[in-house]
């Protein structure tokens, strides 16, 4: 069996890692970066770009470049009104679900996420030199059941068997504590990423990683800080020029990139100048945006976001039954923890300097890889005890939510409770499964509904209906209801909001494989053309250098083969290019043998080579990386 890779599927960036022996390794992508932008773009020519390639063209193609798709995963259309307004791409309602409309096709958030996962899968395969089919994927600790199911579906579409869904702060704690298995400490993991915020309190000791409580906000992250800067820039420009740049998709994308850059710069500087020339134009001519932003101004306009950070911290500490003074370390995770004000808030709340020993962009993927190693048996003496982030229950008489599993219950877990009918001679009951912390059913999230029928008629309150909630190690819920009198049972694995059917997933998997095949075909085409270009160049160079030394009866065949290769490179298929290259090489072999056999012939004529690695990059040899034609002089034993 192959390796189980660990993937941090982030809102802004994604990262993949794998266990190499006893140590986790973060894998660089094809661009040489250890993180990959969580972006997908569709070009006018029909190409699909993922990662850095998608990010590079976002300004000129905003309507067809998808980012922050994680904010839509597992959520209904009416649950994302704010996210919908901020996205430059079209979000449409399809059967109550949020879909991304690109040209004439509507993509589910799971499909877009799968494209990013495919990129991470390919990155791992290129590094390992073998196929990868199994993964541990991380999610925010405060993701609900629907969002976890949707993430698992995305993995299936990408061709991955998702062995475990693991909470991001828990993964970070694994990475932080792997070499501290013999010590005992209480740790708070403060995870502020691109789109979500989690805070988890854990106890580490003797290789056991036990989550005591978790809390968070799935609507709070780096994107929200960026949006504050975007609105500030747009408002300032509107005051100066009377033009609202938010109505121009390309200008808005430029504002987004500038806002992200300014936010990063303000982490190390107290002010920054945002300079966007030719941001728009009027009859008077082009307009330029030049605005100075100070760190103090940034912190003031984001004050409400900073306030929102503290609320989950209070709840997490309270629910953990751990005193703040007893917390030994506060580990910072997520790129947004680099914001100085965030670090100051953490220090003020916990009364200690936060621990910055881990890489906030990579630590979650590292933890996922460690969990993969645990599942494979490569990592021993590690036990992970995670929790269910939200309470789970059913609707009972009066529209009340009756909880069966409380928030922060260690998982996996199984809870049973007996209920009865609300009316005389009632022969069926509807089980309305809910997730949330509010007392009334209507204020919580519906995970699913199912019916248990054929209950024998009886007075109200007499039948005994046993309801069982079962949460697996991925935090995914199954529910069953059983009539204790008849033994009749009905059960469901919650098919929650955004859950795709098996048929839909299989279709999307086929589409994903087709795209992978198309991508491979395009790469082969590019590689063959690059190789052909190299061969054409070296052939023409040899023809010029050898000149009249080439026999006159051989030159037409050589030039004809060269022209044939040029034509194939312009208009031919990969196969025709390879055939033309073979033909040219064959003619050169014939010419070379004639040159060697000619009386007094020099021996530096050889078949031209393309000297490329198939991707257009020149192969290097020797100490200085230059490719040279070496000339050899034959000498005798006396050095003459």
From Swiss-Prot:
Entry keyword Thylakoid: no
Domain of life: Bacteria
Protein induction: By stress conditions e.g. heat shock.
Residue stretches of biased makeup (Polar residues): 603-615
Gene3D superfamilies (alphabetical): 1.20.1270.10, 3.30.420.40, Actin, Chain A, domain 4, Substrate Binding Domain Of DNAk, Chain A, domain 1
Annotated spans, Disordered: 547-575, 595-640
Biased composition, class Basic and acidic residues, residue ranges: 547-569
Phosphothreonine carried by residues: 196
InterPro entries on file: ATPase_NBD (IPR043129), Chaperone_DnaK (IPR012725), Heat_shock_70_CS (IPR018181), HSP70_C_sf (IPR029048), HSP70_peptide-bd_sf (IPR029047), Hsp_70_fam (IPR013126)
Compositional bias annotation for Acidic residues: 625-634
Pfam families named among the record's database cross-references: HSP70
GO molecular function: ATP binding; ATP-dependent protein folding chaperone; unfolded protein binding
Keywords assigned by UniProt, alphabetized: ATP-binding, Chaperone, Nucleotide-binding, Phosphoprotein, Stress response
Chain's role: Acts as a chaperone.
Family classification: Belongs to the heat shock protein 70 family.
Protein known as: Chaperone protein DnaK
Organism: Chlorobium phaeobacteroides (strain DSM 266 / SMG 266 / 2430)
């Amino acid at each position: 069996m192959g390796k189980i890779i660990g993937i941090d599927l982030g809102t802004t960036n994604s990262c993949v890692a794998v266990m190499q022996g006893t140590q986790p390794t973060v894998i660089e992508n094809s661009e040489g970066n250890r993180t990959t932008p969580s972006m997908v773009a569709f070009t006018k020519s029909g190409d699909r770009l993922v990662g850095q390639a998608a990010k590079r063209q976002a300004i000129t193609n905003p309507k067809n470049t998808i980012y922050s798709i994680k904010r839509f995963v597992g959520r209904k259309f009416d649950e994302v009104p704010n996210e919908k307004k901020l996205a430059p791409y079209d979000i449409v309602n399809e059967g109550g679900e949020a879909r991304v409309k690109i040209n004439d096709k509507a993509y589910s958030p799971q499909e877009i996420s799968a494209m990013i996962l495919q990129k991470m899968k390919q990155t791992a395969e290129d590094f390992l030199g073998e196929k990868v089919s199994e993964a541990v994927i991380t999610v925010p600790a405060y993701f609900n059941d629907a969002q976890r199911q949707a993430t698992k579906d995305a993995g299936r579409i990408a061709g991955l068997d998702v062995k475990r869904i693991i909470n991001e702060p828990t993964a970070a704690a694994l990475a932080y504590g792997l070499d501290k298995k013999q010590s005992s400490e209480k740790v708070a993991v403060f995870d502020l990423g691109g789109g979500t915020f989690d805070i988890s309190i854990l106890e580490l000791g003797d290789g056991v990683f036990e989550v005591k409580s978790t809390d968070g906000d799935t609507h709070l992250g780096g994107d929200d800080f960026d949006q504050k800067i975007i609105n500030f820039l747009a408002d300032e420009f509107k005051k100066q020029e009377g033009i609202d740049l938010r109505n121009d998709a390309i200008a808005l994308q430029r504002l987004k990139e500038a806002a992200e850059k300014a936010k990063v710069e303000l982490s190390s500087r107290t002010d920054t100048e945002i300079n966007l020339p030719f941001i728009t134009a009027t009859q008077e001519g082009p307009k330029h945006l030049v605005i100075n932003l100070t760190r103090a101004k940034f912190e003031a306009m984001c004050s409400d976001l900073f306030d929102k950070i503290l609320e989950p911290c209070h709840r997490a500490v309270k629910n953990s039954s751990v005193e703040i003074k007893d917390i030994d370390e506060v580990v910072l995770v997520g790129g947004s923890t680099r914001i100085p004000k965030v670090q100051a808030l953490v220090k003020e709340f916990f009364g200690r300097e936060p621990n910055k020993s881990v890489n906030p962009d990579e630590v979650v993927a590292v933890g996922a890889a460690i969990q993969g190693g645990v599942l494979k048996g490569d990592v021993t003496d590690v036990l992970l005890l995670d929790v269910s982030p939200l309470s789970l229950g059913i609707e009972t008489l009066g529209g009340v939510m009756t909880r069966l599993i409380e928030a922060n219950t260690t998982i996996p877990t199984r809870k049973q409770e007996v209920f009865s009918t609300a009316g005389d001679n009632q022969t069926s009951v509807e089980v309305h499964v809910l997730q949330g912390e509010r007392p009334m059913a209507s204020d919580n999230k519906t995970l699913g509904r199912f019916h248990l029928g054929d209950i024998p008629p009886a007075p109200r309150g007499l039948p005994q209906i046993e309801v069982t909630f079962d949460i697996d190690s991925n935090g995914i819920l199954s529910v069953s209801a059983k009539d204790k009198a008849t033994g009749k049972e009905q059960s469901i694995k919650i098919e929650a909001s955004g859950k795709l059917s098996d048929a839909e997933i299989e279709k999307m998997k086929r589409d994903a494989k087709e795209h992978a095949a198309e991508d491979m075909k395009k790469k082969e085409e590019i590689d063959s053309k690059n190789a052909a270009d190299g061969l054409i160049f070296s052939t023409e160079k040899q023809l010029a250098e050898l000149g009249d030394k080439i026999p006159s009866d051989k030159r037409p065949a050589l030039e004809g083969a060269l022209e044939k290769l040029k034509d194939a490179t312009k208009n031919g298929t990969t196969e025709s290019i390879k055939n033309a290259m073979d033909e040219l090489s064959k003619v050169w072999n014939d010419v070379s043998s004639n040159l060697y056999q000619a009386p007094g012939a020099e021996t530096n004529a050889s078949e031209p080579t393309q000297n490329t690695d198939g991707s257009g990059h020149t192969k290097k040899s020797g100490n200085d990386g230059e490719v040279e034609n070496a000339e050899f002089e034959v000498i005798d034993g006396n050095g003459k």
